[in-house]
Amino acid sequence: MAIILGIDPGSRVTGYGVIRQAGRHLEYLGSGVIRTSVTDLPTRLKRIYMGVNEIILQYQPDMFAIEEVFLAKNANSALKLGQARGAAIVAAVNHDLPVFEYAARLVKQTVVGIGSADKIQVQDMVTRILTLSEKPQADAADALAIAITHAHSLQHAFHVTNSAQATEKPEKTTALLKARYSRGRFRLKI
């Protein structure tokens, strides 16, 4: 059994989603957004760091999954997004959580079945997969989709290694993934 925290980073709105994986079963634990004001960037980054830190303390996840930076036409936007990711990752690393990164296209492909899916399609599928009574906010749904993608990756790792005990031992799973993928970062791109 593993608790996975998914993060959809943004300099103004950062989504988070927490799920528990037990074998093939996924259980919704919580989701929401960390909103920052329109103040200066360092203050926004501090708010993201502190918000992720609070979420980690509340849910005690075993693993941390985050969306990779995409190539944006606006370099300034890409830099701000990278800084927001960095603030969230530092919070995870300060709690000794293993960090796994996923391309947005892979997340959409995993959850919806189409790498070019829109936010509404992601919301719909996350709602179905986790059997939620209502759709989560768009950024929270994206974060849940990232967590679901990581859970799917773990299931694939279990299948490949044929390890029946791995679902009950997240530290064994983490060691396996770190051994298979460089520096503890799981990177798949479509």
From Swiss-Prot:
A GO cellular component entry from the record = cytoplasm
Q: Provide the alphabetized UniProt keywords.
A: Cytoplasm, DNA damage, DNA recombination, DNA repair, DNA-binding, Endonuclease, Hydrolase, Magnesium, Metal-binding, Nuclease
One GO process term, biological-process aspect: DNA repair
Where Mg(2+) 1 is bound, by residue? D8, D139
Highest rank taxon of the organism: Bacteria
Reaction equation(s) it catalyzes: Endonucleolytic cleavage at a junction such as a reciprocal single-stranded crossover between two homologous DNA duplexes (Holliday junction)
The residues forming a coiled coil are none
Q: InterPro entries, alphabetically?
A: RNaseH-like_sf, RNaseH_sf, X-over_junc_endoDNase_Mg_BS, X-over_junc_endoDNase_RuvC
Please provide an example of a Pfam family that matches this protein in its UniProt record: RuvC
Catalytic residue positions: D8, E67, D139
Annotated GO molecular function terms are: crossover junction DNA endonuclease activity; DNA binding; magnesium ion binding
Q: What is its main location?
A: cytoplasm
EC number(s): the record gives 3.1.21.10
Q: Which residues bind Mg(2+) 2?
A: E67
| Oligomer and partners | Homodimer which binds Holliday junction (HJ) DNA. The HJ becomes 2-fold symmetrical on binding to RuvC with unstacked arms; it has a different conformation from HJ DNA in complex with RuvA. In the full resolvosome a probable DNA-RuvA(4)-RuvB(12)-RuvC(2) complex forms which resolves the HJ.
Q: What does this protein do?
A: The RuvA-RuvB-RuvC complex processes Holliday junction (HJ) DNA during genetic recombination and DNA repair. Endonuclease that resolves HJ intermediates. Cleaves cruciform DNA by making single-stranded nicks across the HJ at symmetrical positions within the homologous arms, yielding a 5'-phosphate and a 3'-hydroxyl group; requires a central core of homology in the junction. The consensus cleavage sequence is 5'-(A/T)TT(C/G)-3'. Cleavage occurs on the 3'-side of the TT dinucleotide at the point of strand exchange.
Q: State the protein's name.
A: Crossover junction endodeoxyribonuclease RuvC
Gene name of this polypeptide? ruvC
